[in-house]
Each structure stands twice: as C-alpha cells, then as structure tokens.
Amino acid sequence: TTIQKPAINQLHKIVYDLSTAKPHVPNAEKTETALFQEIALQLNKHSEDDHVDFYVERNIPFMLSKLGPKGATADINKDELEDLFIGGANGQASQLYIQGSNGFKLQQIPDFEKYKFTDVTASFFFDADQDGDQDLFVGGGGNTAPAASDIYQNQLYLNDGKGGFTLKSGSFLISHTNCGIAIPLDYDKDGKLDIFIGSRSEPQQYGIAPKSFLYHN
C-alpha cells in the first residue's frame, strides 16, 4: 500500500488487513551455474564440554573455553588431494580425514587420544623436520583448568609420509597460557620454519597480560 502526499498536521490511522497480507519475499536471481554446491562430507559431530567459565570468573565478557575447534588442511600423503584436520575439545580427541575419490575418510591416529582433554585453539601443517612431508602443530588452549594444568601443552605430530602421525614429546615446554594463535615463520632465515605462539589469556585469570612465545627450529 502506498499513500501519496498525505495531508500534514493530521493523524493518519492505517489499518492492515492481516487476513490477506503476504510476506514480501524477493525473487532470487537464477543462475545457470551455482557458485557453491553442497557436499556430504560425513564428518563426525563436534562435541563441547559443559564447562561454564562464568562460574569461576564473573568478570569475563565471554567464555574463553569455547573458542574451538580449529582446523587445518594439507596434502599429507602426497596424492595431490587436500586432507583435513579438525581439532578436538575437552573430552573429544582431534580428528584427521584423508581425502579420496569418494570423499573423506577418518584416519585413526592413536596419539590424538593422549590429549583429548585439551581444547585445540590453533593448528597448522608444516614440514617441521624437513623430510618433505607435512607435519602437524596443535595449540593447547581453553579455560577449563588453572594455568598449572598440562591441558595447555602445545603439541607436534610428525608425519610418516603416508598419513600416519606420531606425537613428538618434549617439543615444547608447557606454556601455561591459553594459546590464541600460532604462526609458522622462518624468522632467522636458516631454511627451517620456526613457530610464534600468541597467547590469548592467562587461564582463569582474565585481565592479566599473558606471555607469548617464539620457538626456534
């Protein structure tokens, strides 16, 4: 309904007949070729724990234990197909999916179970040992335990070249901080990728400035 030139200095009462009203739905432009197409990936559902940060820290603006999962992609078995890593949460192990001609298939990595209590808040693939395949960095984070807990351990998994990964223990000291971001970079230009880890927060001590770290490879 359009009212042309309504009189001024008057009260106009407009009554809509709701019995005949229809919502306005604009017609979407039809294209011969869609830009995106849905693909059934058959990935396992992510599961969060029931921890509530506000019970411990009442002054935080949002929960710092629900910032995952983080993922990463790389061709880990040299078949020219991108494979997929999805980080886990407290109580759920991380998952690795190998891409094939029929889609993605879950690859069993037993060492992922060792840190199933960690919230994965950063991850990326890189060639850590310079053997020509893609290894995996996983950042430990969250806010479900005090800073002294080992759930904040950052992890390095070495690739056997066929899609199997083994935890390289002792690669990083426990940072005791909530990992916010991790970036591979060759800061000293020696041909090896080093790692910068930016901390988001001190676990369960919101407001305290956390330390960040630079690891030399």
What label would you give each PLM region?
Residues L67-K78, D119-Q130, L158, S171, ...:
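Beta-propeller blade termini
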Residues D83-G88, L136-G140, I195-S199:
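Hydrophobic beta-strand segments that make up the repeating blades of beta-propeller
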Residues N90-A93, G142-P146, S201-Q205:
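Short glycine/acidic-enriched loop and turn motifs that connect beta-strands
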Residues A93-Q107, A147-K168, G207-N217:
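Beta-propeller blade repeat segments, especially FG-GAP/WD-type strand-to-loop junctions
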